[in-house]
Curated annotation (Swiss-Prot):
The keyword Methyltransferase applies. This is Dimethylamine methyltransferase MtbB1. Its EC number is 2.1.1.249. Keywords: Methanogenesis, Methyltransferase, Pyrrolysine, Transferase. It catalyses: Co(I)-[dimethylamine-specific corrinoid protein] + dimethylamine + H(+) = methyl-Co(III)-[dimethylamine-specific corrinoid protein] + methylamine.
């Protein structure tokens, strides 16, 4: 009897498959992506490697030494203090505690602050509160800290917003009116996002994470691209990550263009050049998980799409890998076996420059991804590599080479806790455990500025406030 391997369905349910069936599923998944995206399927060697990853005997797997990548985040501290019946675990804690827990306890390379609603529009009335929270976090933290939110253009339609719902208008065959409503909503989305980030950047934010971009279709993508363009023009040093909502941009409008390209129907490898053109530093491509398909099918399909996006993108690609995307099951407590296998496959086969950790409980998301493929932040040199990706648009190989040269170490040493612990203390760039008298917060980041030859926004704010 053929050996069967314990894998997952797209909803997280356990399923047992023989190697022959696993290969059939991988071939079908990569063929589906190749057909839809008109891109190359995985090679025979890549499919065999993916099968080997899926069939590894351990519950958790990880990338090979030296292949670690930085991680970014979606939903910020909500996975800790959130309690809405989704993936939040309802721990009563401040956002400062949540951010520092990711930095000091989870080994995150970057982190983000976000509003409990996690959309830009609701931030407007409480932006002063968000600015104060950002300042306090920046004074205490060392890793890059973004402000994260969803463009969420749907909030601009009735009953939540001022413009009539285009879905209702279309049902009434008022097509032009529906188009007008989407265009007006996109303009307001752009305006609000710029205004909010002007305030947050003035309060020391390293940058912005546009999460779930294009959730409301091509109008949402259109408004976000124009917001990125305006922010880049006003703030050349701002870190900007653009993470998508789905694998294909839905044509809710159908006629909107950016840089002469129609936005409706774009796949990840077609979205990447537009995100770069707008002025982002990092692109977060997405591939949806099909809950009725197996993990070999879903992961092969996701890796195929993302591999092509990485290939054509001039920007570093941090693939979005929360529950329900990136080959990961759609489950609030994502299975560790599935998460770590998807994480390893994206790094070793798709060649991603980083991973955007999405929705899921703390153990199933940040802890699993960081254990599988992360650089472990301040435990090693993950925060430094991430800063070079966002400061200079460096892909993973270039960023690692740059940081290794500055530290006078081998590339493989960048994720070595033993080597980096002593080196970080010697250079006074912040250590993960408490050392009396060592640089912390702004002081450590000022030393990182000198080491890497970059500017850090919270340090610029400190100098402005002190006149030094």
């Amino acid at each position: 009897m053929a050996t069967e391997y314990a894998l997952r369905m797209g909803d997280g349910k356990r399923v047992f498959l023989a190697r022959e069936k696993i290969m059939e599923e991988i071939e079908a998944g990569t063929a589906n992506a190749a057909d839809l995206g008109e891109i190359p399927a995985l090679s025979a060697d890549e499919m065999n490697k993916l099968a080997e990853i899926l069939m590894m005997p351990g519950k958790a797997v990880s990338v090979e030494h030296g292949m670690e990548i930085p991680v970014t985040h979606d939903i910020g501290t909500i996975r800790l203090d959130g309690d809405q019946g989704n993936s939040g675990v309802g721990i009563p804690s401040s956002r400062l505690v949540g951010c520092m827990m990711h930095e000091r306890a989870f080994g995150a390379d970057t982190m983000e602050l976000g509003h409990i609603d996690y959309s830009f529009k609701p931030v407007k009335p409480v932006v002063a509160n968000e600015c104060q929270a950002m300042e306090v976090c920046q004074q205490n933290m060392i890793i890059p800290l973004f402000y994260g939110a969803m463009p969420n253009m749907g909030l601009y339609y009735t009953p939540d917003g001022p413009f009539e719902n285009p879905g209702d208008l279309m049902k009434a065959f008022k097509i032009q009116e529906a188009w007008d409503s989407m265009e007006h909503a996109a303009e307001h989305l752009t305006r609000d996002t710029i205004w909010i980030m002007q305030k947050l950047f003035a309060s020391g934010a390293d940058g912005v994470n546009f999460d779930t971009t294009a959730a409301a279709g091509d109008g949402d993508f259109y408004g976000t691209l124009h917001a990125i363009e305006a922010l880049r023009k006003e703030f050349p040093e701002m870190y900007i990550e653009a993470g998508m909502a789905g694998e294909m941009v839905l044509g809710m409008h159908g006629n909107l263009q950016y840089d002469g390209v129609t936005l409706a129907g774009l796949w990840p490898h077609q979205q990447a050049p537009l995100v770069a053109k707008a002025g982002a530093n990092v692109f977060g491509p997405v591939v949806n998980t099909n809950t009725s398909k197996t993990s070999p099918w879903n992961l092969a399909r996701a890796v195929t799409f993302i591999k092509e996006a990485v290939k054509v993108s001039s920007l570093p690609c941090h693939v979005d890998m929360g529950m329900g995307v990136g080959g990961i099951p759609m489950l609030e407590t994502p299975p560790i076996d599935a998460v770590t296998r998807a994480s390893k496959a994206m790094v070793e086969i798709a060649g991603v420059d980083g991973i955007o950790i999405g929705v899921g409980d703390p153990l199933g998301m940040p802890i699993s991804h960081i254990m599988a493929s992360g650089m472990t932040g301040m435990r090693a040199a993950g925060d430094l590599v991430a800063r070079m990706q966002f400061s200079k648009n460096m892909k993973i190989k270039e960023a690692k080479e740059y940081v290794a040269k500055k530290l006078n170490v081998e590339i493989r040493d960048l994720a070595d806790e033993y080597i980096m612990r002593e080196l970080r203390e010697e250079l006074n760039i912040g250590v993960i455990t408490s050392v009396p008298g060592s640089a912390k917060g702004i002081a450590a980041k000022m030393n990182i500025e000198k080491l890497l030859g970059i500017k850090i926004n919270s340090c610029e704010l400190f100098r402005k406030q002190t006149g030094k």
